[in-house]
Amino acid sequence: MITVKLYGLLRIESGIKQKQLEAESVQQVLDVLCALGISQKDLKGCTILVNGNSVTKRSKLKDGDTVVLMSPVAGG
């Protein structure tokens, strides 16, 4: 089981703080989140961390991993 945590606008717009799911890759996590109503546009610009390390969509996951998705920060 993978733990997915959302931060920033991703959390606000989706209403999802944390979700447990089965996935073998970061891309599968993104696909599930799209199926739950988060737009691909919102996910495209987000920072992706697995167990605190920056990764790509192609990165593989293993049981117990924590995936963190953070929307870009803007402002001045």
Give a label for each model feature.
Residues 1-74:
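Ubiquitin-like/PB1-type beta-grasp interaction modules and other compact soluble beta-rich domains
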